[in-house]
Amino acid sequence: MGPRSCTHFATLFMPLWALAFCFLVVLPIPAQTTSLQNAKDDRRLQELESKIGGEIDQPIANLVGPSFSLFGDRRNQKTMSFGRRVPLISRPIIPIELDLLMDNDDERTKAKRFDDYGHMRFGKRGGDDQFDDYGHMRFGR
């Protein structure tokens, strides 16, 4: 077995090692992908529980907490064919009731602030008619 046969073996086994490396490292194994999906689902569930926990009173949150931990394993739910525990509802940051109570007159002030050419108007401060639309004092009338 000379040096020539060693190079022959090396050239034979190089593609095999590369192929084995691809199978082991590059291609995802189904068990790993399901565990990654489970980890993502668990993280999403924890974020949802933290959002719900912030909205619930503290004594009620203590009662609800253990029930969530009993059913925390998502794999058991999939085998038992449970649906989603908590429906995902998109809610605005400011509640509707508070939005009705707030006085947002930004649209009204913006309409008064600029003229048709985009120039800022300084007139009509406080409802006075002593200034014109460009902020110049009117002496007539």
Curated annotation (Swiss-Prot):
Cellular localization per UniProt: Secreted
Induction data: Up-regulated 24 hours after starvation and then appears to return to normal expression levels 48 hours after nutritional starvation.
Keywords of this entry: Amidation, Cleavage on pair of basic residues, Hormone, Neuropeptide, Secreted, Signal, Sulfation
Tissues expressing this chain: Expressed in larval brain tissue localizing to cells in the anterior and medial protocerebrum. Expressed in cells in the brain lobe, optic lobe, subesophageal ganglion, thoracic ganglia and the eighth abdominal neuromere. Drosulfakinin-0 is expressed in the central nervous system including the subesophageal ganglion and an abdominal ganglion.
GO molecular function: neuropeptide hormone activity; neuropeptide receptor binding
Signal peptide (from-to): 1-33
Entry keyword annotation includes ATP-binding: no
Propeptide: 34-73, 86-111
Main location: secreted
Outcome of gene disruption: In adults, RNAi-mediated knockdown in insulin-producing cells or all Dsk-expressing cells, increases total food intake and the number of feeding bouts over a 24 hour period. However, feeding them the CCK antagonist SR 27897 does not result in a further increase in total food intake and feeding bouts, as in wild-type adults.
Modified residues (Phenylalanine amide): F82, F122, F139
Pfam families: Sulfakinin
Modified residues (Sulfotyrosine): Y117, Y134
GO BP terms, alphabetized: adult feeding behavior; adult locomotory behavior; inter-male aggressive behavior; larval locomotory behavior; multicellular organismal response to stress; neuromuscular junction development; neuropeptide signaling pathway; positive regulation of cytosolic calcium ion concentration
Classification via InterPro entries: Gastrin/cholecystokinin_CS, Sulfakinin
Gene Ontology terms: cellular component: extracellular space
Function (record text): Involved in diverse biological roles including regulating aspects of gut function, satiety and food ingestion, hyperactivity, and aggression. Regulates gut muscle contraction in adults but not in larvae. Functions downstream of TfAP-2 and twz in octopamine signaling pathways to modulate feeding and male aggression.
Similarity comment: family membership: Belongs to the gastrin/cholecystokinin family.
Protein name per the record: Drosulfakinins
Taxonomy of the source species: Eukaryota, Metazoa, Ecdysozoa, Arthropoda, Hexapoda
